[in-house]
């Protein structure tokens, strides 16, 4: 380890010792994959940040009610906060065993792919991102009016390959499946219209990052552009960004049940301990440092698979797929870096400098200090790049300080955060999970790249667009397969180039945000049609809030 890293750890811990309350409120600085300081990406307007409206936005997405609001504030691992409930394979619960296995650091073989969050105010997948005339305005209506004035139907009959290939991902999909009603495209614009009609605006943060985050590692990376034909034999090119967009929408709207740990917290000013600044609200303390440490090591290090990271009070981290981690020890008594575990481990009897003694689990016998740096993928702007590989991903890093509580057997049983802006909600679909619509079973027959879609696929796809606002899983998966044919995945560079975070471009000022864009809806189950040539009329599509709620509740 370099002397610079050791100095940084010691300096940070000295700052914690001198002014614990201030340090507890510090936002973890962000760096790129090479460790260079960078500005964290955010989807929120400055007004939403200043008013802390982003906290309500996160809470609305989680949609999971914890058991009561009171109870213990001790930092023992709670029932809704167990790493075993999240990870694919839970193997290690002792620091010595983790170190012996060489898992104090780990990096996935390939990073989850970066993509846009496909903002609702730009029409979600209806945004013509490659069209230089598309306004990409903060005003939903300005964007929608442009699409209405320049209809896809006219472009498709123009004979201009350049114009056709600049259509939005949803417009290309509607053309591919022969949907003259443009059901998928209209569904995206309809999402924004309801908010616009109610509030006169659509919040900049509203999008489908909750679909991109799992889709980025549950589905393979599109490696190259794919040209396919419409039923009228019109060639259309789907660029990697277009295919990623469809994958993100699929996972946003029809994803299976999700495994998660942590809970909801919508308190803009949670109660804190006056002496330390530590959050004392039991719901807003999630996730426990012990759970966090065990989840990261056992999921990324052991299971070799990503998971999604969220931090309630850090507007720069929202639904980010994790990619790598590394951690180091420090002595919590002296608050100095230590290279060896036994030097960093202190008994509770000797831990006289413990600032969090009032919150310790009664089963704690030893405490070890940890500094962990976690790498995660952030959003990028879509492009007409012909090929994609991990070198185009945007990777950022955040560093967290905490200590771990060990029992008499030196098993990790809890811990204390040294920062309130810490990971508090982790989630992932099961490894074998598949996002698919209720109509995928009707897509019978096979589809070859050089041929138009079979009629059964077209019928099923149009039904899925109308009733579930989602692309057919079979089509998305085939587009990915076509894009990967004959290609060898490129390993991620080390280090990766400087990431390009994507705060929402807003040519016009974003109006003052409404902290609660819409009342919490009543969850509605995904409609399941009767497999038949002509499905019965489906109920209205659920909003993205309802779909997310249904996923978290396993419905």
Residue ranges and their predicted role:
Residues 292-296, 534, 551-555:
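Generic low-polarity alpha-helical segments
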Residues 488, 492-540:
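Ser/Thr-rich, Proline-interspersed low-complexity disordered segments
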Residues 537-555:
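Composition-driven, intrinsically disordered low-complexity tracts enriched in small residues
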Residues 2-444, 448-454, 458-463, 467, ...:
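Active-site-adjacent structural elements in enzyme catalytic domains
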């Amino acid at each position: 380890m370099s002397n610079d890293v050791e100095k940084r750890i010691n300096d940070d811990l000295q700052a914690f010792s001198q002014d614990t309350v201030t340090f507890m409120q510090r936002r973890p600085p962000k760096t790129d994959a090479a460790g260079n300081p960078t500005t964290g990406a955010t989807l929120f307007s400055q007004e939403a940040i200043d008013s802390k409206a982003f906290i309500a936005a996160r809470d609305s997405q989680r949609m999971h009610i914890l058991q009561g609001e009171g109870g213990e504030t001790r930092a023992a691992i709670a029932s809704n906060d167990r790493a075993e409930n999240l990870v694919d394979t839970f193997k290690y619960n002792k620091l010595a065993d983790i170190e012996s296995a060489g898992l104090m650091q780990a990096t996935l073989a390939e990073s989850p792919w970066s993509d846009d969050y496909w903002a609702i105010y730009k029409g979600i997948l209806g945004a013509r991102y490659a069209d230089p005339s598309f306004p990409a305005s903060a005003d939903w209506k300005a964007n929608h009016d442009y699409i209405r004035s320049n209809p896809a139907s006219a472009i498709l009959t123009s004979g201009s390959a350049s114009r056709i290939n600049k259509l939005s991902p949803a417009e290309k999909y509607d053309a591919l499946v022969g949907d003259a009603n443009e059901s998928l495209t209209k569904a995206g614009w309809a999402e924004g219209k309801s908010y616009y009609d109610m509030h006169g605006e659509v919040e900049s943060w509203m999008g489908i990052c909750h679909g991109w985050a799992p889709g980025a590692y549950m589905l393979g990376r599109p490696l190259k552009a794919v040209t396919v034909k419409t039923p009228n034999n019109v060639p259309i090119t789907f660029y990697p960004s277009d295919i990623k967009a469809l994958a993100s929408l699929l996972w946003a709207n029809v994803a299976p049940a999700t495994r998660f740990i942590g809970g909801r917290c919508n308190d803009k000013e949670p109660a804190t301990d006056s002496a330390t600044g530590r959050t004392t609200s039991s719901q807003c303390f999630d996730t426990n440092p012990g759970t966090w440490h065990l989840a990261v090591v056992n999921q990324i290090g052991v299971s070799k698979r990503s998971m999604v990271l969220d931090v309630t009070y850090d507007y720069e981290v929202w639904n980010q797929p994790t990619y790598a981690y590394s951690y180091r020890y420090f002595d919590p008594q002296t608050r100095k870096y230590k290279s060896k575990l036994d030097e960093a481990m202190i008994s509770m009897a000797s831990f006289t400098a413990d600032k969090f003694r009032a919150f310790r689990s009664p089963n704690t016998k030893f405490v070890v200090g940890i500094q962990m740096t976690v790498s995660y993928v952030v959003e990028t702007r879509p492009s007409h790049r012909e090929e994609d590989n991990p070198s185009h991903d945007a990777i950022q890093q955040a560093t967290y300080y905490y200590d771990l509580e060990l029992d008499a057997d030196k098993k990790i049983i809890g811990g204390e955060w040294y920062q309130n802006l810490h990971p508090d909600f982790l989630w992932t679909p099961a490894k074998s999970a598949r996002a698919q619509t209720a109509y995928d079973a009707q897509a019978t027959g096979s589809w070859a790249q050089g041929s138009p879609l079979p009629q059964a696929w077209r019928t099923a796809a149009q039904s899925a667009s109308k009733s579930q606002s989602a692309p057919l899983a079979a089509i998305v998966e085939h587009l990915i397969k076509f894009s990967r044919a004959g290609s060898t995945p490129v390993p991620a560079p080390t280090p990766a180039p400087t990431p390009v975070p994507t705060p929402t471009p807003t040519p016009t000022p974003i109006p003052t945000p409404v902290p609660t864009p819409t009342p919490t809806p009543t969850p509605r189950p995904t409609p399941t049609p009767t497999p038949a040539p002509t499905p019965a009329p489906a109920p209205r599509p659920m909003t993205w809030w309802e779909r997310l709620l249904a996923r978290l509740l396993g419905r």
